[in-house]
């Protein structure tokens, strides 16, 4: 008699539901490819536009209607956006998953794999009796921050006060108060409630997956495992694990691959790559200061100026005088194939907002960072990069200023400190690769044991 898993792949079927923000979407869909390559069939529940042609032919796709006010989605109120999306998603997701289980049987689905930002999805899956795996697309330290957030408010660390910005936070080393997770464009209480719901949902999960390296967050991962009593898995660097995954949400600006040809003409390690990711924004005067800082550094650069980078403007023409100053030395693109840029031998530094995906990609390619965090977890990421791992320099100041931009670039490219940073980053690159079994010496009859191996075993045990 045929098994109820017939047609579901040798290892069973996983329902994957990515969160519809680019920085969240890509890691989840990339890990889904890794699971698929290891014998698991994939059904993608999705709330945003994606093209099935970008994925393996045997993927299934199930739309889930999620609605929100376009004005809200265009805002920077992250807490309200995520809260609204979860509220809208709950009933449609339950209906879709229930229909799938009714049509194919409970045993047809091993588990639901989703983003912890979909706290409603984690909760609904558990309620329906399906094991749920949550992926943290930020650092493990960020989930530790979620868990401590109410305490931080009760002890007066938050909201951040000017006179306390430089104070250490003993509850969350190595942070200073100014490094604490926050979204200044959202209400603090609403943000705290969102994080509390996320932690509650994570506690009910059958496992938590982190796009991080055991090398850099071993203690934090152990702390989370102990506090939540949930298995934890560190699967970074996903860009090395599944290097060919290129699909993304529709609406993201097409990458300009011409910058790779320009990089081919530059000296090894000479170019600064500048990007603030898919969501971070800056005021017009900061854009001007950054432009002049890059010009004054005399450093070759590739700068990503996406359409919504500058608040109030749809495009970002270089300020008067800058274009002439940097002609032949720097190029500006609307979007870049970041992983390929960071892997290019001409790139010797990355001026970044320290979004977690960008931080992980920089480490995996051994590219030192100039850190310029903008919101959320990026401040804490910067503290680890600069003060704990010592693989980057901090761009000092709350507002971008051309002199500080130039100084931070000069520290990375023209000092003994910069050379030491580059040497440490080479070590991190090697260690990151070994974390997923690349460059590991093993017996010829064995495969290197990794957290991904353990994760697949867990899924197949459900």
From Swiss-Prot:
Pfam families per the UniProt record, alphabetical: UDPGT
Disulfide pairings: none
Temperature-dependent activity: Optimum temperature is 45 degrees Celsius.
pH dependence: Optimum pH is 8.5.
GO cellular component assignments: cytoplasm
Cross-referenced SUPFAM superfamilies: UDP-Glycosyltransferase/glycogen phosphorylase
Keyword Transferase assigned: yes
Catalytic activity: DIMBOA + UDP-alpha-D-glucose = DIMBOA beta-D-glucoside + UDP + H(+); DIBOA + UDP-alpha-D-glucose = DIBOA beta-D-glucoside + UDP + H(+)
InterPro entries, sorted: UDP_glucos_trans
Protein name from the UniProt record: DIMBOA UDP-glucosyltransferase BX9
Source organism: Zea mays
